[in-house]
UniProtKB/Swiss-Prot annotation:
Disulphide bridges, residue numbers: none
Protein name as annotated: Ectoine/proline transporter ProP
Induction: Induced upon hyperosmotic conditions, resulting in an increase of its transport activity.
Entry's localization field: Cell membrane
Main location as per UniProt: membrane
InterPro entries xref list: H+-coupled_symporters, MFS_dom, MFS_sugar_transport-like, MFS_trans_sf, Sugar_transporter_CS
Keyword terms: Amino-acid transport, Cell membrane, Membrane, Stress response, Symport, Transmembrane, Transmembrane helix, Transport
Activity regulation, per record: Uptake is activated by osmotic stress. Inhibited by CCCP.
Family: Belongs to the major facilitator superfamily.
One GO BP annotation of this record: amino acid transport
Gene Ontology MF terms in the entry: symporter activity
Residue ranges of the region described as Disordered: 477-504
């Protein structure tokens, strides 16, 4: 990480001008955010479907397996998709840094929609035996590969497009879309379950009903891909492309352009580790609340599948709608204080939440889920604003792809599988709570080494504002403003520019 620099003006230091500042008015921000959020909605819509159909799909895809392995075999579908995510990040991250964020986001959206719909067309184990489960895993791997670039690209895109002073607010809409997508998936499963069982009998979901939610990805995917084709490229990426001789962090040169992923890992190992720790805490809580909760409520609490789906929807919707307000709060007080609050809330609330949940009443379950949602919401609201700010523009997509996907694949996506396995082995009802608390404690340590990024331009980028008057204000106060560090901005190298003019 770069050392703290003095604000004292240095001779020949580049000066920020009004033309350098990116002015992105709200009328340009809104469609860009909308086109990005739809991808996260689609991704988590699939998680909602798969999570709430896990028990049903056990009967469809695991015939012939020992009973104690059937549920774990379907839950392994979660894990296998996440194990592939780092590969998607390693391939799509550098590609996004090279060809642009918008192009990669278009491709990931198309892959995700097609693979989700194809799951709904798979033959069952009754038709082709174990090959049904193999094909399911293959399609989950395609999903994992695409989402390996999707979230890293989406957070990078939103962070680079959002004004510096409101990055937390606009970034929170990305994860609002995620959890609304999950709630939508849960709602579709609940409605489909009720309709099919009511009109076609108790086995209707296993016979054909499970396919319907996956096939709804076809119209949703068409809309999402269309919206992705209409989003512009980010100003930060375009500025980085326009300035091939840019000088950023001279004394801590970013070697990504020369060394690729090896350079990102070698030079940015500290923000990578910080990102991995924070993402692990965020996603163990997030996936426990979403992907694992349907299984826990059915298998451990004894709720009917439709009730297990329905009871989490209001919690997810309310939490989702509050995320922009948490993001706005982080713009005022900073990302680190909000993250610290999330860590403390996790350590205090998680065990009582699972103890209350195991009393078994619907009221108790709602209270317990609300308690789990508090730290989860505090964590996820900051992901799109805090995590991309750890890395400079030239390697932001790659850095996000590595840190986010490694952490999610090892600690987030495996949460349902690992917690269910530990629960079966120990019989301890609070195992999920202890698992979540462990990773939050690690995140608390990582926060000690994290640099505050609220209100500041992204590393390797010029400031981004909403109005011309803000740009004028920043230029006027650039020497006094503690949030402006000219050494991290992509000014042209005067020597190289002069040499190019001489050779022209």
């Amino acid at each position: 990480m770069s050392p703290i620099r003095s604000k004292k003006k240095i001779k020949n230091e580049p000066r920020l001008t009004v033309d350098d500042v990116n002015v992105v008015p709200p009328k340009k921000i809104r469609p860009a955010i909308k086109g990005t959020v739809v991808g996260n909605f689609m991704e988590w819509y699939d998680f909602g479907i798969y999570g709430y159909l896990t028990v049903t799909m056990t009967a469809v895809f695991t015939q012939g397996l020992p009973q104690e392995w059937q549920l774990l075999a379907v839950m392994f579908g979660f894990a296998v998709s996440y194990l592939v995510r780092p590969l998607g990040g390693l391939v799509l991250g550098p590609l996004g840094d090279k060809v642009g964020r918008q192009k990669v986001l278009y491709v990931t959206m198309a892959m995700m929609a097609v693979s989700t719909a194809l799951i709904g067309l798979l033959p069952t184990a009754a038709s082709i035996g174990a090959w049904a489960l193999v094909l399911l895993y293959l399609l989950k791997m395609v999903q994992g590969f695409s989402t390996g670039g999707e979230y890293a690209g989406a957070t990078t895109y939103v962070a680079e497009f959002a004004p510096d002073r409101r990055r937390g607010f606009f970034g929170a809409f990305l994860d609002m879309g995620s959890y609304l997508g999950f709630a939508a998936g849960a709602s579709v499963v609940a409605i489909t379950t009720w309709v099919t069982t009511h009109f076609y009998g108790a086995t209707a979901m296993e016979d054909f009903g499970w396919r319907i939610p996956f096939l709804t990805a076809i119209p949703l995917g068409i809309i999402a891909v269309y919206l992705r084709t209409r989003i512009p490229e980010t100003p930060a990426f375009e500025n980085n492309q326009d300035e091939p001789n840019a000088v950023v962090e001279k004394d801590t040169e970013d070697p990504y352009a020369r060394l690729g992923l090896a350079g990102v890992i070698r030079h940015h190992w500290r923000p990578l580790l910080i990102g991995i720790a924070i993402v692990a805490a965020t996603n163990t809580a997030g996936y426990a609340l979403t992907s694992y909760m349907p299984v826990y409520l059915e298998e451990q609490i004894g709720l009917h599948s439709a009730s297990a789906a329905a009871v989490t929807v209001p919690i997810l919707v309310v939490m989702s709608l509050l995320l922009p307000f948490v993001g706005m709060w982080s713009d005022r007080v900073g990302r680190k204080p909000v993250y610290a609050t999330a860590v403390a809330a996790t350590l205090i609330l998680m065990v009582p939440a699972f103890l209350i949940m195991n009393t078994g009443t619907i009221g108790a379950v709602l209270i317990a889920l609300s308690m789990v949602a508090i730290p989860t919401g505090l964590y996820v609201a900051l992901s799109a604003s805090a995590l991309p700010a750890l890395f400079p523009t030239a390697s932001r997509f790659s850095g996000m792809g590595i840190s986010y996907n490694i952490s999610v694949s090892l600690f987030g996506g495996t949460t349902p599988l690992i917690t269910q396995f530990l629960l079966q082995k120990t019989g301890l009802d609070i195992v999920p709570a202890l698992y979540i608390m462990f990773f939050s404690a690690i995140a608390g340590v990582a926060l000690l080494f994290m640099t505050e990024s609220s209100q500041k331009p992204l590393l390797g980028s010029f400031p981004t504002v909403e109005t011309k008057s803000e740009a004028v204000e920043i230029v006027k106060n650039q020497d006094e403003d503690p949030n402006i560090d000219l050494s991290h901005m992509p000014f042209p190298d005067e020597e190289n520019v002069g040499a190019e003019k001489q050779n022209a």
